[in-house]
C-alpha cells in the first residue's frame, strides 16, 4: 500500500512540474539553460580556439571533428580521408554515399614495445562514439575502441591532404598523405578511378625498432540492399592481386549493377596478404584481425571461393634511430554499371563535330570502347569504357 502511495505522489509531482514548466516564461527557461557554467566554459573555449585558427591553416583539436578530404578521379567516384585519418564517404557506385564508412584502416605495431600496436589515426570524435547507430551497445565491429594516436593535425593542399600523428612515449611519428590522380591539362588521367594513401613512419627514439605496418578492410562491396532470396544475388569474394587484394561483388540477373571491385595494394615487394579473415559470429573477424596486429604478426592466408568477411596486408620493416619509411597504399575501383537513368528513350544519334564544341561520343572521338555491346540504357561511368576490369585500371 505504501508503494502505491509513493508512486501516486511521484506522479503528482511530475504532473505539477510539467504544468509549471509549460507556463513559465521562455526568458526564465532560457536563463536557467544559460546559467550552466560548464556549457559556458566549453562554448567560450571553442570560440577562443576558433578565433585563433587562420583560414586554410592546419586543423587540430575540435576542428578535426567534421573535416574530410575527397580522394578520387574527377567524375569517377571517391572516398574521403578525414582529419583524424579515418576513411569514410565511400561513394564509388555513381552516386553520393556520404555516411558510408567502409571499415578500411591502417595499423602499425612496434615489436617489443608495451602497447606498441595502434590504429594509424587520431582520436575518434565524440559524435561518432556517442551519436552513431549501435554506439549505445559499444559500436561492435568498429575500430572506435582500439588504440589510436593521441595527437593529430590535418593540412589540406589540393590534391594532397597530410595528417601528422604523434603519441607521447611512443618510438614512432606517423604521417598520412592522401592524394588523387590530378594532372593539369590531362583530363583522362585526372579522371581515373583511383587514389592513394602514403604512410610515413619515423623512428624518433635512439634504438633500432622492428615494425609491421598493415592495412585492413571489410568486404564493403557487398550491397546494403540485396534480393531476399540469396540464390538470386551475385557472389561476394576477395581475390588476389600483386601485393594486395581485391574486394569483389558479382552482379546478378536482377541486379547487374551490384557488380564491382575495389583493389588495395602496396608498392612493397615483401607484402604478405591475408585474403580471408576468420569467419565467425558477431565481430569475431575484426577481433582476430586485431590480435594479429597486436602480436605484430604477418599472416598469410590464401583466397577462398566466397564469403570472406575481410582481408589484410602486412609489410614488415626495420628502422634505425632517425630513419624513415614510406609505404604507399594504392586503391583502384571498378563499378562498370549503375541503376541510374535520367530522361526518356534515346533518339537517333546526333551528328556531332567535336571541334564545334558539342559533346561527341567516345566512338566519334576514336576512343576504344571496352564493352561495345552494352545496351542496358543506364548510366555507365566514363572509365568503364576505357578499362575492361579493375586489374587493367590499376
Question: Each predicted region: which residue ranges?
Answer:
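A short catalytic or substrate-binding loop motif that flags glycine-/basic-rich loops and adjacent residues
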Residues: 61, 70-72, 154-157, 191-193, ...
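Beta-strand-rich N-terminal accessory domains
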Residues: 11, 36-127
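Acidic/polar, glycine-enriched structural segments that form the non-catalytic walls/loops
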Residues: 34-53, 58-59, 162, 167-171, ...
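Secretory targeting signals
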Residues: 1-6, 32
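An extended acidic
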Residues: 85, 96-169, 251-293
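N-terminal export signals
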Residues: 10-32
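Residue-level recognition of alpha-helix boundary/capping or hinge positions
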Residues: 5, 11, 113, 123, ...
